[in-house]
């Protein structure tokens, strides 16, 4: 075996307290997940699975941090020395390794653990190594500046100083599969992370109310969960186009019930996906009282439509706690850019409904639209999704959405010769520099001669939370589209 850095991996208490047969299965899954975490990290690695410890040799300098981020790991330490289980050698090597470190600080402690048959005990290690280091510092067993650790096994001993805390929990994949309703905001990714930490594999269901730019932002957030926290699994994002479903809802239900009915439709979509892929539960980011649809009465009305269990890990947490967790998970910065779209926000939403009243509201809904949307959904393999995949398909548009703000990024002369009715003239550099002047409540379609410059500007705008697109093919394609749609020029504009 190559002489690679050695890491001592401690198992989460959630794993070590299991019955022997269950623990063996869980530990086997943890090793599988560790292999996947390290295989994409670069460099060689080797894993040795023992009952009470997992030993990892890995070439990459960031391996300790990567190992600590695998669910089921309590902590990890890089081993400074590996030697025979001989007390004199342990003391001599420990003295040489740590005397300078102890000398640079004021206090130290020696901690020792031992298993197997030896002519000495853990206390002997602590006393003799402590005595050897005592000239360089002061012993403090309560709050030492430096902790020197020794683990003695049957055939070898390990010396290390310090440990990195792991995320704990259960190995991902040992507790079955669920689907998570994801919106891209702060809440649902944190709820997903908490479920992943308990060993639940997840696929994600996104009910899209607002087009490709919104999908791109949600996919970017969800990819963080896939790439950084789903080692050993291959989660997918199921994108369900809810445009026709929402139009039907608006036309056939009272506005004050829109939010609750929408949530029930989303639950139906999530359950349909869950049953199709063999998932056993639905997960959401709802918290009691955070918005009008999340009162107890409304949650009861929403829950009634699901036959699978619905889990809400964030039920009792406030927003500040959720945002702090999102920062730790790594989704906060992306979620902060996501505007959670909702085209059906009434002035006075119902705050306490019932299953009976909401069911009555749904009498005239065409649920075949929902079934069609679920059946026609597209699915993204999040682990295989690349940076290019998250940019190119979402930048271009080949039609002008109703109410969109048009930005013409050509020269004044070209603008005078022809421009889309109502379009604002913005030089390319101005469009990029002055984007903060624009409202994030509008949809923006940018066009230039060939659609290349505006693709870059649309990319910059999407990164900071705008729903912005470049018209595919530039001004020639836009003129053709306008002619087919019989878009009429306003007075003073050239056809």
Predicted regions and their residues:
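Flexible, polar/low-complexity N-terminal or interdomain linker segments that lie immediately upstream
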Residues: 113-115, 364-417, 489-495
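RNA-binding accessory domains that recognize and position tRNA/RNA substrates
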Residues: 1-179, 189-234, 304, 352-353, ...
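A short alpha-helix-loop-beta-strand transition element characteristic
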Residues: 330-338
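Short, ordered loop/turn segments at secondary-structure junctions
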Residues: 207-210, 242-243, 286-290, 313-316, ...
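Rhodanese-like catalytic fold shared by cysteine-dependent sulfurtransferases
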Residues: 412, 416-443, 450-495
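A conserved beta-strand->alpha-helix junction
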Residues: 223-251, 339, 344
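Active-site adenylate/phosphate-handling loop in enzymes that bind or generate adenylated species
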Residues: 128-133, 163-175, 229, 246, ...
